[in-house]
Amino acid sequence: MAGRLVLGTRGSPLALAQAEACAAGLRAAGFAVELRRIRTTSDRRPDDPLSVIDQRDVFTRQLDEALLAGEVDLAVHSMKDVPTEVPEGIVLAAVAGRADPSDALVSEGGWGVDGLPEGARVATSSLRRRAQLLHRRPDLRVVEIRGNVDTRIRKMRAGAAEAVVLARAGLVRLGLEVPHAVIPHDVLLPAVGQGALAVAVRRGDPRLEEIRRALNDPAAEREVAAERALLRALEGGCRVPVGARAVAGGRGVLLRGVVVSPDGAALCGGEERGEEPEEVGRRLAARLLERGAAGILGFVRGVKP
């Protein structure tokens, strides 16, 4: 079938790099692809902390609306930004290749988390990162930061902080050579779906299977399925302090997860292994809730603006 596709994407350099990677795969499968930039809520409110934007789909809503309206044929998102429940009429056709999901600590000194000076300021807009960093280093001062990858690094270098936490996948995809340390997962577990790309299409699109064959990574799909099942069972979103990392191998999936209080004082963690990714995610969620995660998540929801 092939044919022409209009691919919707945010306009940031990272979003465009991710969209171009998917477009290349589609072109190799015989599609003609046009990229169309769409501004999302996050782009329109670049200086507002995510905690005050009362919207789970802050990075995806306008792309979803364009998809449902027929303005674009598919949309590419960072999987970590996609709510666990996608809008009616939209399906995730593919999980495109997953880069290293780890977080990176960017600083002029190239410090790791344990090497940061006492009381150092670390910039991040993520509650997940804040909570896990404070669990490891209660002395750190975590400061809010917004903007695309280049903007955050520039703000850090201008004196906003001694270091900034970014997804390592973003640095790699942008080809940025900056001093940084990859943060081990026993210090900072990634966001659900971090490093993977989500390809969304309209339900019933006759090209869905062709798009899937061109872009889907089965191992990444299994990993993401386990992580998103965990988050869904915890009734969380991108603004709750949940970290997860699934590793697919053979027929099984190993999933690790943590829920951490915003001040870092309390942490519930565990792991599960099994053959069915979503069942693994649900089992781990049940275990974490029994261990105290329910109280942490209830507190977080209660104190949000």
UniProtKB/Swiss-Prot annotation:
This is Porphobilinogen deaminase. It is an enzyme of class 2 (transferase). Pfam families: Porphobil_deam, Porphobil_deamC. GO terms for cellular component: cytoplasm. The keyword Transferase applies. GO terms for biological process: protoporphyrinogen IX biosynthetic process. Pathway: Porphyrin-containing compound metabolism; protoporphyrin-IX biosynthesis; coproporphyrinogen-III from 5-aminolevulinate: step 2/4. The porphobilinogen subunits are added to the dipyrromethane group. The modification S-(dipyrrolylmethanemethyl)cysteine is found at C238. It catalyses: 4 porphobilinogen + H2O = hydroxymethylbilane + 4 NH4(+). Its cofactor is dipyrromethane. Monomer. Belongs to the HMBS family. PROSITE patterns: PORPHOBILINOGEN_DEAM. One of its GO terms (molecular function) is hydroxymethylbilane synthase activity. SUPFAM superfamilies: Periplasmic binding protein-like II, Porphobilinogen deaminase (hydroxymethylbilane synthase), C-terminal domain. Its EC number is 2.5.1.61. InterPro entries: HemC (IPR000860), Porphobilin_deaminase_cofac_BS (IPR022419), Porphobilin_deaminase_N (IPR022417), Porphobilinogen_deaminase_C (IPR022418), Porphobilinogen_deaminase_C_sf (IPR036803). The keyword Transferase applies. It comes from the Bacteria. Tetrapolymerization of the monopyrrole PBG into the hydroxymethylbilane pre-uroporphyrinogen in several discrete steps. Keywords: Porphyrin biosynthesis, Transferase. Binds 1 dipyrromethane group covalently.
